[in-house]
């Protein structure tokens, strides 16, 4: 299906973004054995992933974080702040070690200068991994967007230190020409 078709399908289903189909595909592939009580959505704007999680797992507590504004999603606790300040957000910090799922579709604003963009992406990915290590419970799951670049192997090795399982996914809903991929880890 073409990217525009995914966007149209998302709109028809009431979702804010086609990225929901990327998350749905990854969750279907990993077939989680449990329900998610607490979910942390990092880089949540415009809110499609939070919206999808809340719709699929109605009794889940969803905590969303982004530096950008996000229109409210029913039942989602949104915090306009940086991932760097997550430990200062009381409602999230009190659940340290109690999240079943950390999802991150976060990406920096791209400059067009490859070396700078790769470094910025890598830095955000490292912060996401650190948050997941600290906030996930045992057997918790992390799903994180990254990009195919020369830092991917380093990123995977870093994840393998703290996660029992590490896998890479390229969802069908991702644009074919995009270097975007997703890393999945089980703590």
List each language-model region with its residue ranges:
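Class I S-adenosyl-L-methionine
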Residues: 146-187
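Conserved beta-strand signature within the Rossmann-like core of class I S-adenosyl-L-methionine
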Residues: 139-146
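Class I SAM-dependent methyltransferase Rossmann-like catalytic core
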Residues: 1-34
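S-adenosyl-L-methionine
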Residues: 67-111
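Conserved SAM-binding loop of SAM-dependent methyltransferases across substrates and taxa
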Residues: 46-58
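Conserved SAM-binding motif I beta-strand of class I
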Residues: 61-66
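Mobile active-site "lid"/loop adjacent to the S-adenosyl-L-methionine
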Residues: 97-137
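Conserved class I S-adenosyl-L-methionine
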Residues: 35-45
